[in-house]
Amino acid sequence: MNKKLLRARRALKLRKKLYLLGSVRLVVYRSLRHMYAQIVSEDNCNVLVAASTTEKLIASKLRVTGNKEAAAVVGQVIAERAFKKGIVHVSFDRSGFKYHGRVQILAEYARQFGLKF
């Protein structure tokens, strides 16, 4: 088995558990160049809030969009946007990625700026 398949299997297991909880999810995805974060509704149909380093507003603040500094900015922005929509409690969906590095930084900054998970 390759790395991508193993990550996808971990993600499916985690998403099944979160679906049974029935809570709003903070979904994180990382690529080599960018970080993406979305808050998805309980029924998995609607994206309520989103932030990523592909947005001009966020990318203009950064020199490089694929590092820990970029993850911190995305975490801050997603938390601020969620707070404006009245979302405080979420479940953290790391999409099968290890809770380390950029994923961990994004989560810490989202917590620091008001999200609870």
Curated annotation (Swiss-Prot):
Q: Print the keywords alphabetically.
A: Ribonucleoprotein, Ribosomal protein, RNA-binding, rRNA-binding
Query: Which InterPro entries does this entry report, sorted A to Z?
Result: Ribosomal_uL18_bac-type, Ribosomal_uL18_bac/euk
Keyword Ribosomal protein listed? The answer is: yes
**Gene Ontology CC terms:** cytosolic large ribosomal subunit
Alphabetically, which GO biological process terms does the record hold? translation
Question: Out of the domains of life, which is the source?
Answer: Bacteria
Coiled coil (UniProt feature):
none
MF terms (GO), sorted A to Z: 5S rRNA binding; structural constituent of ribosome
One Pfam family named in its UniProt record: Ribosomal_L18p
Q: Which Gene3D superfamilies does its entry note?
A: 3.30.420.100
NCBIfam families noted in UniProt: L18_bact
Hey, which family's this protein in? Belongs to the universal ribosomal protein uL18 family.
On assembly, the entry states: Part of the 50S ribosomal subunit; part of the 5S rRNA/L5/L18/L25 subcomplex. Contacts the 5S and 23S rRNAs.
Describe the function of this protein. Answer: This is one of the proteins that bind and probably mediate the attachment of the 5S RNA into the large ribosomal subunit, where it forms part of the central protuberance.
Report what the protein is called. Large ribosomal subunit protein uL18
Q: What is the lineage of its organism?
A: Bacteria, Pseudomonadati, Pseudomonadota, Gammaproteobacteria, Enterobacterales
